[in-house]
Each structure stands twice: as C-alpha cells, then as structure tokens.
C-alpha cells in the first residue's frame, strides 16, 4: 500500500512508482523492455502472487513505457508475463509444492531446480517483448498507434 499510495501526500511529491520509472528510463533507456518481465518476476517472488506483483508494479511499468515513448499496454503485459514466471520461485508456492509431493525440508533443492527454467522463461519473455516493441513495431492498442 505504501508504494501504491505514495503519491497521496501533502508535499506534491511524485509517487514512488513514478520516481522509479524516471530513474529507470534515464539509466536503462530503450533496452528496458527486455528487463520488464524480470521486474514482474521479482515482484511475484517478493509478494508471492502474480496479482499482487501486478498491483504493485503496473504503474511503474506503465510510466516507464510512457517516458520511453513505448506501449504502456505491452509493458504491463510483459510485467504480467514475468510475474507468472516469478510464481514458479515464490517461496510459499515452493513450500506448498514440496509439501504436496512429500519433499518437506527440501525446498532449497526445489527452488534451485526451478531457477533455471525461470531464467529461460524470463530471457524468452524479454526477447519477445523487445521483438514486439521494436522489431514488429507494435504500438499501444489502447491508443490505436502503431
């Protein structure tokens, strides 16, 4: 809630997602779409949920896209795809899966074995995001641009 509602203040300060978007747009620039799914995965790993990751980070992704002149809808979609990957390594999901198959106490092994598929997934998602935004010139469907 603090991250999401940080723009509601008496000092007219920008919200944390907007400030983070400005920093990322200035430092990473046009290659950011490659990393957008990884941000979603990090959010899901921390929050333990694709939905909560999207709630926390969609404003950040959308603003970053706007600052870079890219499709906000595509960037938020990349966020969601990455958050799905992050669910594979979310701790409570690893614990639940380990308990279900009788591997209690071996969560670390399960997590290590899940990391490689997660990384492949994120590399593919980042590459496809770059291809869609730059190679195919897909614009923002919400604004009917191309």
Give, region by region, the residue ranges found by the protein language model.
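Alpha-helical transmembrane segments of multi-pass membrane proteins, especially transporters
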Residues: 14, 33-36, 40, 54-59, ...
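Alpha-helical transmembrane segments of multi-pass membrane proteins
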Residues: 29-44, 68-89
């Amino acid at each position: 809630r603090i991250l999401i509602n940080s723009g509601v203040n008496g000092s007219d300060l920008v919200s944390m997602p907007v400030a983070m978007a400005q920093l990322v747009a200035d430092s990473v620039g046009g290659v950011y779409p490659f990393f957008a799914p990884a941000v979603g995965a990090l959010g899901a790993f921390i929050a333990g949920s694709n939905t909560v990751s999207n709630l926390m980070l969609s404003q950040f992704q959308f603003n970053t896209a706007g600052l870079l002149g890219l499709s906000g809808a595509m960037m938020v979609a990349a966020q969601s795809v990455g958050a799905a990957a992050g669910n594979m390594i979310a701790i409570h999901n690893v614990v639940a899966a380990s308990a279900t198959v009788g591997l209690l106490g071996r969560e670390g092994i399960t997590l290590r074995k899940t990391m490689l598929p997660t990384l492949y997934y994120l590399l593919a998602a980042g590459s496809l995001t770059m291809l869609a935004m730059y190679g195919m010139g897909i614009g923002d469907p919400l604004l009917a641009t191309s």
